[in-house]
Amino acid sequence: MNDIDREEPCAAAAVPESMAAHVMGYKWARDKVGQSGCAVYRLHSKSGGSDLFLKHGKDAFADDVTDEMVRLRWLAGHISVPSVVSFVRTPNQAWLLTTAIHGKTAYQVLKSDFGARLVVVDALAAFMRRLHAIPVSECSVQQWTTHAGLPERGSIEAGVVDVDDFDKEREGWTAEQVWEAMHRLLPLAPDPVVTHGDFSLDNLLIVEGKVVGCIDVGRAGIADRYQDLAVLWNCLEEFEPSLQERLVAQYGIADPDRRKLQFHLLLDELF
């Protein structure tokens, strides 16, 4: 997928007055990948400068945008993430303007140069190790669940789980069936680290075979390391199953916990 596939040109969106000066003179495009209820725009510089990204959320999604701003500012002291240029919050809306990280997503690289697949997977594993090595004691953000119990049922009870987007293995399932399948896998021994929360191929940027940063960190926080491993494991299945085994080996796990992988694959269906 190239940039044209990911975006469609659009008119400039309305922004708060305090943010207007930051977005003047850019060519706007609406991002079509991974918006998760928010409007995401890429602002292309016309003068050869750096591009920007604008994320806008309303109501509950305004909280998601706010969460991402908080995590970006904290993670900036530990790993490469977009810099916050401007942030505005009102009771019902939030706007987050950030710098764009140079590079192609890991998904784009694998699609365009499958011969680079081993280099890419090794780079992703190395970046995940760096992220997970951040001291948990320095992070105040807890993720959805520990393995003493299941996560909050909020998304199920609110009826916002997209059952049509479930993985092939769970086509036709209800959200309750996913919940029950998760319950059958408990208890699991917790292994908390600082996680990305959505460590997918579209959220990792690569230049010359190395990960240069990550984006969409609104779900980052303390959780089991298998949360990130499971998300990336699932993404790699599209390309070659052997890449999944290489991922966990390069990460440093000789014998992956299949129950934990399955638990987190199920958990991801609910978000």
Curated annotation (Swiss-Prot):
Swiss-Prot/TrEMBL catalytic activity: kanamycin A + ATP = kanamycin 3'-phosphate + ADP + H(+)
Superkingdom, natural source: Bacteria
Alphabetized Pfam families for the sequence: APH (PF01636)
Active site: 198 (proton acceptor)
Gene Ontology MF terms: ATP binding; kanamycin kinase activity
Keyword Ribonucleoprotein (UniProt): no
Listed Gene3D superfamilies: 3.90.1200.10, Phosphorylase Kinase, domain 1
EC number: 2.7.1.95
BP-aspect Gene Ontology terms: response to antibiotic
Keywords, comma-separated and alphabetical: Antibiotic resistance, ATP-binding, Kinase, Nucleotide-binding, Plasmid, Transferase
Keyword Nucleotide-binding: yes
SUPFAM superfamilies named among the record's database cross-references: Protein kinase-like (PK-like)
Family (UniProt): Belongs to the aminoglycoside phosphotransferase family.
Chain's role: Resistance to kanamycin and structurally-related aminoglycosides, including amikacin.
Descriptive protein name: Aminoglycoside 3'-phosphotransferase
Gene from which this protein is expressed: aphA
